[in-house]
Swiss-Prot record:
Name of the protein: Methionine--tRNA ligase
UniProt motif ('KMSKS' region) ranges: 346-350
Pfam families for the chain: Anticodon_3 (PF19303), tRNA-synt_1g (PF09334)
Record family assignment: Belongs to the class-I aminoacyl-tRNA synthetase family. MetG type 1 subfamily.
Transmembrane regions: none
Enzyme class: ligase
Cofactor list: Zn(2+)
CDD domains recorded: Anticodon_Ia_Met (cd07957), MetRS_core (cd00814)
Keywords attached to this entry: Aminoacyl-tRNA synthetase, ATP-binding, Cytoplasm, Ligase, Metal-binding, Nucleotide-binding, Protein biosynthesis, Zinc
Catalytic activity line of the entry: tRNA(Met) + L-methionine + ATP = L-methionyl-tRNA(Met) + AMP + diphosphate
Organism expressing this protein natively: Cereibacter sphaeroides (strain ATCC 17029 / ATH 2.4.9) (Rhodobacter sphaeroides)
Amino acid sequence: MARILITSAIPYINGIKHLGNLVGSQLPADLYARYMRGRGHEVMFICATDEHGTPAELAAAKAGKPVEDYCAEMHEVQKEIAAGFRLSFDHFGRSSSARNHRLTQHFAGALAENGFIEEVVERQFFSVADNRFLPDRYIEGTCPNCGYDKARGDQCENCTKQLDPTDLIDPRSAISGSTELELRETKHLYLRQRALKDEIEAWIDSKTDWPVLTTSIAKKWLHDGEGLQDRGITRDLKWGVPVRKGSEPWPGMEGKVFYVWFDAPIEYIAGTAEWADANGKTDADWERWWRTDRGAEDVRYVQFMGKDNVPFHTLSFPATIMGSREPWKLVDYIKSFNYLNYDGGQFSTSQGRGVFMDQALSILPADYWRWWLLSHAPENSDSEFTWENFQSSVNKDLADVLGNLVSRVTKFCRSKFGETVPAGGSPGEREHQLVAELQQRLAAYEACMEAMEVRKAASELRALWVAGNEYLQSAAPWTVVKTDPEQAQAMIRLALNLIRLYAVISRPFIPDAAASMMTSLGCEDWSWPADVGRALEVLPAGHGFTTPEVLFRKITDEERAEWQTRFSGVRS
């Protein structure tokens, strides 16, 4: 049994996330966590809300609420929606937790002690209208790289280029919109990433199995232009982790907080500590996942994120870990994703464009969305959500293939043999061929899941469903029963066991449907099918079942057209 630590990029607190956020981090992370648990491994799956920085302050101000209250409310909203999508976090934490405050301050102190923090006097925009310094995300303007007119002072969300506020063309305050900005002096802490460049580069070079998307972005940031730069890790904000050197005050840094991108990844560790606190466990219980001197040396750590988060996870967070000179666990594998677009444009939380997670669940249950998003995950390139494709995929894959098999088998058995697994007959050559095909396809499915090739895994799972349907079409028990009822019973006995097999292996993708299939079969045996032949004998003759309701209903053309109009791309 392996020990797998899984973290998903933590979503910003500023509103409900869209489907692009979901498929770029949390959902594939959940798929992998569910699969690894299903294979019997020990899994720790951590996520949280990212509650500090400009987005939280601006969103709270817009909502007319104190930022602490806003974050507490939105954490519960995001937690509830995550549960609605059946995201199986072991803990869904908060970056504003006391644990994260202490750990962030601890890392800053360790970095300073080791000479990797520099105090820098810099010139920063001061808004005369707002009477305050403006951190980078409080400044908007036109991106000098791509011309996008809503670029932020830290990064352009359109082209992902990292920016300095002074790079922006026609900068303005994100608070008031005022262009009356002055450059004034202020002092901040910088993480000396350049001093750690050789260590970081050697570490990245050692990760020969990483996706091309991950390594290409990391190496681009390492080498393009002037290469890896030192990074400011403090801001002139009120809301955040107060700047301290470990447990001690930091002279000259009074009233400042740590930059959100410094404290947010540390929440992966803090969130695991929060899990221990919430479950009455000790520090040793979470440290065995994170400290290589306390049991984490055999842990495999996998991160999931969108491509815009890759630089922070391949450069800045590793620099924090390495520079601490403490035995913390570094990530082993980073699975990154491209963007999911919406009807010819980009999803965007800040711009309110696209279908959002709460809206999606108000239309259809989670499994419909999970299946489409995972089977169309933007792994090798950007992908696009269209209502036509969504309807086609749901109707063909879920309703016509899997749902149809479950319905035909259970209803036929009920009508001919009652709601018990029939006892007659024995497997023939056709059944043996099916078992061999399923064994081969299952191995391919497992290989894709192990490699985190999400779209290929979905394709292999669908092929497993198709194999069962093709067997039924070929065997035709509804015809055989007229001349050889014993053989028809053997076919249906195998087919009922096939439903259980599909429930077990489909659970990572469609957990609710899997649970429904198992409930109908009156079975609680979720053991992974190492041997398909034996797996197709788990339900014995005489075992009772109930004929389920429709597993997946089809989406009508009228519904598709109505949703297309209703969700035209802008959230009110």
